[in-house]
């Protein structure tokens, strides 16, 4: 999960403006980007494979294909590396070139113009088919990492509205009937980490709605998610990992770090 840590590190740089720490961590960033390119873009097409990269990775693999969410992570990391290179006195041109290459590859090969959202991934072998049923993590990473332009973001969020299962949140004494939650994918059959009702995924999707300009839907999903976890859950005030509405596991864990982080970002 180097990708996620590096993304966190970039956010830290942006938040603090600590250029001394940028210089200290620059060698790590260089090694990380070299490692990503060497292992996950072996064919050099600008699309990156994903292996043990995100929360859902337990049962998630792409057999060497080009993946939207991992390519988006690498786009931002290279884009920012090109900017940070000026601070540390390094040549950032190769990182700028790689970011451009990634963005072009995503738009040419993974963005489905006829549908209006990103494919989950593209097969490495055979007919190099696109897997068109994107997960939540594909949509929100595309928006959060900056590969989606405003119209692509709008269209991708309509995919969430229209193709990701919506589950009403209902409870005795709960008067607000507008609350709902989402499953992470529309994939079948059910298996762990591939089709869950997971609070960090919901909060990151709410953030994507805010970033995409739909503040009303963002707040409704955010409120729904926190109400279901902190008020309706088995442990008052808890920030859970999985929801009561998860089909197999049900409510899971107490004050899990992933949703705590996303609750902080959305707040």
Positions of PLM-derived features:
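The feature captures the catalytic groove of carbohydrate-active enzymes
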Residues: 1-4, 34-98, 104, 109-144, ...
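Charged, glycine/proline-rich intrinsically disordered loops and linkers
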Residues: 170, 174-183, 243-252
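C-terminal capping/lid segments that line or modulate ligand- or cofactor-binding pockets
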Residues: 1, 5-6, 119-159, 191-267
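Alpha-solenoid helical repeat scaffolds
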Residues: 15, 84-87, 215, 228
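Hydrophobic or amphipathic alpha-helical targeting/insertion segments
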Residues: 8, 12-16, 22
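Alpha-helix N-cap and loop-to-helix initiation/capping positions
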Residues: 21-24, 94, 264
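Long, well-ordered core segments of solenoidal/helical folds
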Residues: 25-45, 98-117, 149-178, 215-234
């Amino acid at each position: 999960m180097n990708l996620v840590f590096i993304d966190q590190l970039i956010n830290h740089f942006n938040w603090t403006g600590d250029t001394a720490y940028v210089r200290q961590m620059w060698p790590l960033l260089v090694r990380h980007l070299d490692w990503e390119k060497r292992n996950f873009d072996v064919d050099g097409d600008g699309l990156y494979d994903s292996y043990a990269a995100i929360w859902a990775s337990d049962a998630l693999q792409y057999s060497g294909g080009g993946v939207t969410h991992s390519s988006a992570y690498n786009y931002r990391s290279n884009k920012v590396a090109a900017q940070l290179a000026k601070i540390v006195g390094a040549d950032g041109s190769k990182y700028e070139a790689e970011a451009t290459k990634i963005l072009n590859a995503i738009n040419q090969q993974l963005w489905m113009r006829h549908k209006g959202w990103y494919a989950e991934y593209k097969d490495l072998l055979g007919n190099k088919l696109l897997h068109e049923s994107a997960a939540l993590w594909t949509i929100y990473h595309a928006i959060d990492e900056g590969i989606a332009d405003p119209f692509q973001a709008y269209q991708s969020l309509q995919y969430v509205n229209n193709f990701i299962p919506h589950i009403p949140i209902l409870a005795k004494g709960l008067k607000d009937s507008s609350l709902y939650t989402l499953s992470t994918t529309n994939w079948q059959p059910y298996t762990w980490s591939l089709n869950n009702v997971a609070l960090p995924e919901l909060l990151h999707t709410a953030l994507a709605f805010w970033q995409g300009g739909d503040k009303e839907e963002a707040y409704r999903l955010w409120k729904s998610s926190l109400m279901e976890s902190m008020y309706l859950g088995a442990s008052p005030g808890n920030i859970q990992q999985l929801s009561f509405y998860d089909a197999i596991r049900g409510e899971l864990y107490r004050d899990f770090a992933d949703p705590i982080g996303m609750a902080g970002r959305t707040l």
